[in-house]
């Protein structure tokens, strides 16, 4: 299973040089687990979530493990932000991944994090006081991932959150 990743970091201020983007790579096992998460989400017709384990070297995030969460106590999309925040924290886990299956356009689900997703990401940071890695899967082969605190290969400190 190969995922095309569209990493995203804040745009540089006007006049600044563009910032390099972090790259994301997935182990074979993590890629297979993400594929299973997507297939299970489609079969259930509900979004699904999982914990992510990763390591960071230079400007690359290596996702090494994925552990699906059972879809209980969830919102209308099948995801419990509180549960994923509590179960997917350090030191074993470095963030979360979830699926977007509801169509946003005629052809695709949303390819970006929603406002609710951003709130869950903030809850994760507030709980663990650590930079996180977050992904969403929006097709059998595509995902969008973001990593807090990674700018041009340097691990940044969380400031002004």
Where are the regions a protein language model picked out?
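Bacterial N-terminal signal peptides
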Residues: 1-8
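Conserved beta-strand-loop surface patch within small alpha/beta domains used
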Residues: 9-93, 101-161
């Amino acid at each position: 299973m190969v995922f095309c990743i569209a990493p995203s970091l804040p745009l540089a201020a006007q006049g600044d040089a563009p910032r390099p983007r972090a790259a994301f790579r997935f182990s074979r096992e993590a890629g297979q687990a993400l594929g299973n998460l997507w297939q299970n989400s489609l079969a259930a017709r509900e979004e699904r979530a999982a914990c992510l384990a990763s390591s960071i070297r230079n400007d690359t995030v290596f996702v090494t493990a994925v552990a699906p969460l059972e879809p209980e106590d969830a919102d209308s999309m099948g995801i419990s932000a509180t549960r994923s925040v509590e179960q997917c924290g350090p030191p074993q886990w470095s963030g979360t991944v979830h699926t977007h299956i509801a169509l946003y356009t005629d052809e695709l689900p949303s390819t970006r994090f929603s406002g609710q997703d951003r709130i869950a990401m903030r809850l994760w940071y507030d709980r663990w006081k650590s930079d996180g890695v977050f992904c969403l899967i929006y097709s059998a082969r595509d995902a969008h991932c973001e990593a807090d605190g990674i700018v041009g290969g340097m691990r940044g400190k969380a400031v002004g959150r």
